[in-house]
Amino acid sequence: MSRSTPTTLGALKASGYRSRPVKDELRENLIGRLESGDKLFPGIRGYEDSVVPQLVNAILARHDFILLGLRGQAKSRILRQLTGLLDARMPVIAGSEVNDDPLAPISKYGRQAIAEHGDDTPIEWLAREQRYLEKLATPDVTIADIIGDLDPIKAARGGYILSDELTIHYGMLPRANRGIFAMNELPDLSPRIQVGMFNILEEGDVQIKGYPIRLRLDLLIAFTANPEDYTARGKIITPLKDRIAAEVRTHYPKDVETGMAITEQEAWLVRNGRPLQIPTFVREVVERMAFLARMESRVDQRSGVSQRMPIAVLETLVSSAEQRAIRQDEGDVVPRIGDIYASLPAVTGKMELEYEGELHGAGRIARELVSAAAGMTYDDYAGGADVDAIVEYFDNGGVMQVSEDAAASACVTGFGQVPGLLELADLLGLAPEDASDGLRAAACELILEGLVSDQKISRTRGGGYRRAGV
């Protein structure tokens, strides 16, 4: 804190400080961002033409809002980034539990402090991050948690009678005063607690149990919810829904390129080890798995398939390739399609299955997703390439076994026995002839997986390739 920062009420007044409602603060700072062209939500991709404009409208209109979306759609991250639209620091009366404005305190504690100390009332400064409070709505949340209750222990220790305002133990809403309060999974909040939210959303105040006193809070309130839960009759009481001014619907990435950018941004890939080279086509396969899972009828689409799935798969396949590189003493870490199959544990736990899916099993569905995604990626690169010589090799009894821990050099040697395979990888631009063994091996695996998807050859659970129908 600089020497010029006011530490008393008198110094704050002399500085010309002007307090303003938090929604005005957010609005004015947002306008400044828009005028300067700064990015509003750094790290949030794919929402530039959908979610972000709706959020901007809500903030400019000074609205409380709810984000409706499935899991893994950056709802919580968006809410936490709202703090970037707050002032860097904000003055409060020192010791206040409800962030009393030194120029307009709302609590008895704040009023007494000013009455006792006048312009010498000490103030402290809150960073913008301290002005954000978040609560996960669960059925066991109580009114005391959210709004507050009497505290007999505080009354006894302070020598107060229970009717004294100073005996209040404030809940999260009052403690978020002059800031942002976020509640995740709103439909899980019990109806009687939802009723308790009425006043704060419409009149901007709360009533503490047993007190005629009303606290005039200054808040932006934001919620998140699953769309199906939010629209289900009886999950949200109608008067509460009516008081939420704006609904903003989030979504999964609309194209593979955006999904890949998000996955690469979020995945832990920079590791203190061997150099890492992830082929672009491997990244595409990983991302397409998520897109296919979101269209798979055996997967419960009401639950969604989180963007965390491709992130976890990418991290796991890198670990699989890293393990192989260490064991084989290879210089570079280059993931292959086989490493995606080794990453299935990162897939199965992130899909909620329908009844038919439960019958087939998550493992089988995950393997089918890998095969289908590899086939789509191969088709994008192949474009009707001539693969007759490769297919004929397997039709004539040729077999190719590719284990997850096989060295890249050994794989390239083996792939060289299949007529035209390495040449096709070069022709398609997947791996030039002078590329590393790791990249050439990965490219050949993609081609073979594409042929499996096209049912021209078959693949065993152990990574063996042979003629179709075997």
Predicted feature descriptions by range:
Residues T263, V286-A290:
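Short alpha-helical scaffolding segments that buttress acidic/His motifs in well-ordered protein cores
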Residues N272-F281, L292-A366:
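C-terminal helical "lid" subdomain and adjoining coupling/linker elements of P-loop NTPases
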Residues S2-E257, W268-E284, L292, S297-R302, ...:
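Conserved ASCE/P-loop NTPase catalytic core
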